């Protein structure tokens, strides 16, 4: 996926061998260490040919070989989530400067920290509600829910929506971006709807124009990845967040922060199916609550985040 996104922007893409080592079994550790070593050699070759003025890391184990190979190059580390993962923590020793999304991240680092906000694609801001609704075929007669589980989808969110689909469509128009994994199941459910309800259900496996979906929606139901800290504030979009329970706790920290700021409601994954419909009904019956959530989300927006990061990179590169 990363390769196709990078190439779509006309940027050269190169891959290297890499593998994580934290939490890896003793059986797999030799293999992963070998991949790490091969990644360092591959990164050295690429850096020697490319001769970068600055390195920019956003985490992930694939960054470790590049950091080891490029210790002589000025480096900016960007922390997208509030709490840095283990890979990001291991990269801090190589960073000349650290950029963070919110001030909550500053306590994790001793080095100079720059709060930039979460950088967004410029095309997101091109959409307004009217244009987005027309593009997606939204009637605008009912409140609009955006259901989104990331590029691969979120099974528990998809299933909770399917289990409550007719009740939801009685009160809402829904944009449901399911991901490829559950798409056939979602498609089958859509085909079984009566015509009136099917017209309110805009289901897709993937949507490149995410700005349209965000601009058209009144509420989003999603995981709590780092993009929630940037995309939802840009549109002042209140959120029902369902942190992914089977990974590092960064999603829980992100969700709790947005809830603390009054911009989101947090539901546990295991209780989502039972609580989703009730939660949405309560929220949309309280117009003042929705209004305050929108305002709170707007307050967290950093529309110039990418510009700030670019400025930091230019300064480090000395150009």
Positions of predicted regions on the chain:
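Conserved nucleotide-sugar phosphate-binding/catalytic loop shared by glycosyltransferases and other
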Residues: 1-38, 44-45, 180, 268-270
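Donor-nucleotide binding loops and adjacent catalytic segments primarily
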Residues: 5, 129-134, 138-219, 251-255, ...
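Active-site-proximal region of nucleotide-activated glycan assembly enzymes
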Residues: 12, 71-130, 135
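Glycosyltransferases and closely related glycan-assembly transferases
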Residues: 42-55, 62-76, 89-97
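Acidic donor-binding loop of glycosyltransferase active sites
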Residues: 52-54, 207, 211-229, 237
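A short acidic/histidine/glycine-rich donor-binding loop in glycosyltransferase catalytic cores
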Residues: 239, 257-269, 281-283
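A short, well-ordered alpha-helix in the C-terminal region of glycosyltransferases
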Residues: 289-303
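C-terminal alpha-helical cap of glycosyltransferases
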Residues: 302-319
């Amino acid at each position: 996926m990363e390769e196709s996104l990078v190439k779509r922007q006309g940027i050269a893409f190169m891959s290297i061998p890499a593998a994580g080592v934290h939490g890896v079994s003793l059986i797999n550790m030799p293999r992963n260490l070998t991949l790490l070593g091969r990644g360092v050699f591959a990164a050295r070759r690429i850096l020697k040919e490319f001769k970068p003025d600055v390195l920019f890391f956003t985490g992930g184990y694939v960054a470790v070989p590049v950091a080891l190979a490029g210790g002589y190059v000025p480096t900016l580390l960007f922390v997208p989530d509030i709490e840095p993962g283990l890979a990001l923590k291991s990269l801090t020793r190589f960073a000349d400067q650290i950029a963070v999304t919110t001030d909550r991240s500053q306590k994790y680092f001793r080095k100079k920290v720059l709060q930039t906000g979460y950088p967004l694609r410029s095309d997101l801001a091109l959409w307004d509600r009217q244009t987005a609704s027309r593009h997606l075929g939204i009637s605008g007669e009912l409140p609009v829910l955006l259901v989104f589980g990331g590029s691969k989808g979120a099974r528990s969110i998809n299933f909770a929506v399917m289990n409550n689909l007719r009740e939801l469509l009685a009160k809402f128009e829904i944009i449901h971006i399911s991901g490829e994994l559950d798409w056939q199941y979602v498609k089958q459910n859509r085909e079984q709807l009566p015509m009136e309800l099917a017209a309110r259900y805009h289901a897709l496996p993937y949507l490149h124009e995410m700005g349209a979906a965000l601009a058209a929606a009144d509420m989003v139901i999603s995981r709590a990845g780092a993009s929630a800290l940037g995309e939802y504030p840009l549109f002042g979009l209140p959120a029902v967040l369902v942190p992914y329970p089977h990974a590092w706790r960064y999603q829980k920290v992100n969700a709790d922060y947005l809830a603390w700021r009054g911009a989101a409601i947090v539901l546990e994954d295991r209780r989502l199916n039972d609580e989703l419909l009730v939660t949405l009904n309560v929220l949309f019956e309280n117009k003042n609550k929705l209004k305050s959530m929108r305002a709170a989300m707007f307050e967290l927006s950093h529309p110039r985040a990418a510009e700030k990061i670019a400025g930091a990179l230019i300064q480090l590169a000395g150009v």
